[in-house]
């Protein structure tokens, strides 16, 4: 069921929305490039207007292609931009991985806008990734930069892109 995904052909807009069902529960959607397009050591830009509201969790993120073989967080996760709906002016950029002791580790940066919400206007959320570091950007301004350490081997492999709104 793709009813939570709509397009506006004239503006090249793809909209993911949360919808309340007759039973009172909510549904949303997830778009993924898994099995179609994967990237490694590239820059990825996504122009988006994020949703806001209590209980919503919009995200632009990537998972390692080998998630079926290694599982999370061993496959690695690159959160280009995540928001919590009750914090409409704050975005998070995070890496999740398995450290040298085989435990979940994360490195997180964030950016808070002082005068507007991420749902008020379109922004470009980016990750610029090479074999030495991963840089997160908002509207071409650096939010966080993480060197790829020896125990972060996940980030030397290919990843696929995911766009979603969790409820």
Which residues are covered by each model-predicted region?
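GH16 jelly-roll
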Residues: 1-167
């Amino acid at each position: 069921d793709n009813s939570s995904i709509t397009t506006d052909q004239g503006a090249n807009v793809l909209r993911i929305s949360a919808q309340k069902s007759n039973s009172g529960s909510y549904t949303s959607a997830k778009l993924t490039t898994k099995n179609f397009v994967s990237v490694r050591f590239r820059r990825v830009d996504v122009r988006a207007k994020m949703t806001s509201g209590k209980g919503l969790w919009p995200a632009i993120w990537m998972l390692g292609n080998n998630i079926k073989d290694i599982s999370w967080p061993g496959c690695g996760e690159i959160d280009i931009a995540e928001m919590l709906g009750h914090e409409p002016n704050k975005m998070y950029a995070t890496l999740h991985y398995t450290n040298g002791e085989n435990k979940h580790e994360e490195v997180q940066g964030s950016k808070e806008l002082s005068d507007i919400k991420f749902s008020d206007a379109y922004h470009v959320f980016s990750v610029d990734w090479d074999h030495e570091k991963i840089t997160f950007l908002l509207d071409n301004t650096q939010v966080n930069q993480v060197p790829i350490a020896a125990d972060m081997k996940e980030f030397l492999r290919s990843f696929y892109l995911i766009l979603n709104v969790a409820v």
